[in-house]
């Protein structure tokens, strides 16, 4: 699996976060994003109320449960040689500061690296994710997802934001599940577990 592929997939996640207003995911500043409870706690500092939806993406090789109002984008990301790679991603924002996303892409035809060393591919994807989200590793667990090499990791940034991810290398395709939260208080462990454990690789266009 190409190192470039791992980098490209992280760029998609960062793209969605940075352009969430332009994409219509949240309202511009001053349009209600600072709603508070009666106790004065900002809406972004408490767990989102999530309604889940079972999603069958067999044509893309997977099934998963995600928060409702799922959207999809395809973002052109450019590799170090100037070539464009189209990366697919589905995502949902149950509140303005909480995001659940799945990105996937196949191995590029050129610039392959570490094709026979899954652990190195997952290491590179993890390290680049933390670099680009400006987070520091908190915990990490190697695992097997239906017999495929996978990796769970959790990271945080200086502002208290939490980034949870699961990387799955299924044959020649790399999947990345990501859940991001503005703070530890806004993160609910059972939501992350439900999201990650609902993901299944199925026969499709792999």
Regions found by a protein language model. Give the residues of each.
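Short, low-complexity patches enriched in S/T/P/G
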Residues: 1-2, 20
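Hydrophobic membrane-insertion alpha-helices, especially the h-region
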Residues: 2-15
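Hydrophobic single-pass membrane-insertion segments
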Residues: 12-31
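N-terminal, intrinsically disordered, polar/charged segments of Gram-positive cell-envelope systems
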Residues: 26-46
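N-terminal "mature-domain start" segment
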Residues: 40-87, 144-145, 193-206
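Surface-exposed amphipathic alpha-helical segments
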Residues: 58, 62, 67-72, 117-133, ...
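Signature of long, low-cysteine stretches enriched in small and polar/charged residues
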Residues: 61, 65-91, 123-170
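A short acidic-to-branched-hydrophobic micro-motif
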Residues: 89-119, 176-177
């Amino acid at each position: 699996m190409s190192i470039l592929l791992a980098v490209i997939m992280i760029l998609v996640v960062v793209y969605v976060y940075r352009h969430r207003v332009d994409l219509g995911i949240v309202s511009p500043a001053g349009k209600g994003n600072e709603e508070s409870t009666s106790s004065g706690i900002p809406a972004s500092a408490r767990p989102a109320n999530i309604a889940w939806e079972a999603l069958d993406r067999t044509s893309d090789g997977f099934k998963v449960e995600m928060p409702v109002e799922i959207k999809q984008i395809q973002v052109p990301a450019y590799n170090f040689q100037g070539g464009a790679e189209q990366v697919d991603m589905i995502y949902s924002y149950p509140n303005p500061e909480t995001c659940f996303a799945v990105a996937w892409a196949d191995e590029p035809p050129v610039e392959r690296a570490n094709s026979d060393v899954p652990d190195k591919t997952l290491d590179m994807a993890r390290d680049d994710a933390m670099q680009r989200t400006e987070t520091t590793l908190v915990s990490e667990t190697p695992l097997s997802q239906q017999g495929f090499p996978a990796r769970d990791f959790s990271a945080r940034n200086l502002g208290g934001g939490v980034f949870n991810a699961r990387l799955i290398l299924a044959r020649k395709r790399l999947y990345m599940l990501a859940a991001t939260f503005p703070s530890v208080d806004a993160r609910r462990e059972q939501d992350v577990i439900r999201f990650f454990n609902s993901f299944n690789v199925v026969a499709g266009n792999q």
